[in-house]
Design a protein with these regions (language model features):
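Conserved N-terminal structural module of periplasmic/extracytoplasmic solute-binding proteins
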Residues: 6-9, 21-88, 232, 284, ...
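C-terminal capping/gating helix-and-loop segments adjacent to ligand/active sites or protein-protein/ligand interfaces
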Residues: 57, 119, 344-398
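A structural signal for short loop-to-beta-strand junctions that line the ligand-binding cleft
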Residues: 70, 78-80, 108-143, 172, ...
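Glycine-centered hinge/linker elements that transmit conformational signals in sensory
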Residues: 161, 204-232
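C-terminal lobe and pocket-closing loops
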Residues: 256-269, 281-372, 402-405
Length: 405
């Protein structure tokens, strides 16, 4: 089983044209529909649109990836709808706790685009609603005042950070999603792929304790010198708020957070943040980032009638009307989306050749091992090679237990 995101998804988003808006909700929902998803702006928009149908209970939680496996394994499932991404869909698919959607798409998904249909082994298992990637965001006013060009490489990021630090214009030159666990692992995945590193050997044994792995960790540590010293608690919301409060000058942050920079209700830097491609590293040509999709799945452990009802509610949440009301909240794959300046960084990252996140069962195990093991290097407890060796050992144990190796 493989979960794949093609850069064609970004091309598809670029080519979408406006369509006619539908009514607020095409039917009156009389059954309770529960959803569990992340809590960023796009999910707020989608779940608010679903709620217009009535009887919708939406749980928005950035720890959704930890809760979903057990919640969807319950019988009946604790939720009808799940919000997922490339990697977070994998454990649900492997466990058989979400259902194929082919029949429901045929009956109620006429508005969906071909590039929204996420197929696993020929079956539609998820509906993609948006694409996402981490890319460079920077304070255009500070960069202009200091004569700094938009950094295209991580070496240029370090040089820019040093100049900004010397100028003393912000609390910290750089922000980073380095929170221990999933976020920190994703930072390594991005950087390691920028070094063109391979995660596994042919037999799915680990392959990260090498020159590329050490170099990736060393670059990550070099960047932390310009971050808030509490970077190991810094997730996407933390970095977003650092930007909005004028505390940092740049970060490689998720495209789904771009619109928040210009939200006048909570941001002090409206119009001052520019979005560009994720940097390359060490002379490479591929951005040190990964491409993602976010979308919707339907629980397996509910009745067919409840599944159909939940799917209808979900379709109301990702329709053209929702996009027209929330165009800037994401790089939508939905009919009616019109790309804006806040999408520029995501499109540039894709156009420059960023690769899809390599979602798979073994990668889920590797991601967990990375998230648990990298901090020991950053804090000085272990050398880079020792940390990578321990991560490989942790992955090997988990992979053998899971039958991957």
């Amino acid at each position: 089983m493989r979960t794949i995101l093609k850069t064609a998804l970004f091309a598809g988003a670029m080519s979408l044209m406006s369509g006619g808006a539908s009514a607020a909700c095409d039917f009156n929902n009389t059954s309770t529909v529960k959803s569990l998803s992340a809590g960023f702006e796009a999910w707020k928009a989608v779940t608010s649109a679903m709620a217009e149908c009535g009887n919708v209970e939406a749980e928005l939680d950035q720890e959704f990836r930890k809760k979903q496996p057990e919640a969807f394994a319950a019988n009946p499932s604790l939720y009808h709808i799940g919000g997922v991404a490339n990697s977070t869909a994998v454990p649900l698919i492997d466990a058989g706790t979400i259902r194929p959607l082919d029949d429901l798409v045929a009956k109620h998904g006429g508005q969906l685009k071909p590039n929204q249909l996420v197929r696993i082994d020929g079956k539609i298992m998820a509906i993609a609603m948006m694409v996402n990637a981490q890319h460079m965001m920077y304070r255009n006013d500070i960069f202009a005042d200091l004569g700094i060009a938009a950094p295209a490489t991580y070496e240029e990021v370090l040089a820019a950070a040093e100049k900004i630090k010397a100028a003393g214009v912000v609390d910290y030159p750089l922000g980073g999603t380095y929170k221990s666990g999933w976020n920190l692992a994703e930072e390594f995945v991005n950087m390691y792929m920028g070094y063109d590193g391979a995660f596994f050997n042919a037999d799915l044994s680990p392959s990260i304790n090498n020159a590329n792995g050490v170099a990736a960790l060393e670059m990550m540590k070099a960047l932390t010198a310009y971050m808030d010293p509490e970077y190991l608690v810094s997730d996407s919301t933390y970095v977003q708020q650092q930007f909005q409060q004028g505390k940092i000058a740049m970060a490689n942050l998720w495209a789904s957070r771009a619109a928040a920079m210009d939200n006048a209700d909570e941001s002090q830097v409206v119009g001052k943040v520019t979005h560009s491609a994720a940097p390359t590293v060490a002379g490479g040509s591929t951005p040190a980032s990964t491409l993602w999709w976010d979308g919707i799945v339907i629980a397996a452990n509910i009745s067919d009638a409840d599944a159909e009802n939940a799917f209808k509610v979900a379709m109301e949440g990702i329709d053209t009307e929702m996009v027209k009301a929330n165009n800037d909240a994401a790089v939508w794959l939905i009919e009616g989306y019109e790309p804006t300046a806040t999408a520029a960084g995501a499109f540039a990252t894709a156009a420059n050749g960023a690769k899809p996140y390599p979602a798979s069962k073994q990668m889920s195990l590797m991601h967990t091992a990375l998230g648990n093991g990298i901090a020991a290097y950053l804090t000085g407890e272990k050398s880079a090679s020792a940390a990578l060796a321990d991560i490989e050992a942790a992955y090997t144990t988990a992979a053998k237990e899971a039958g991957v190796m």
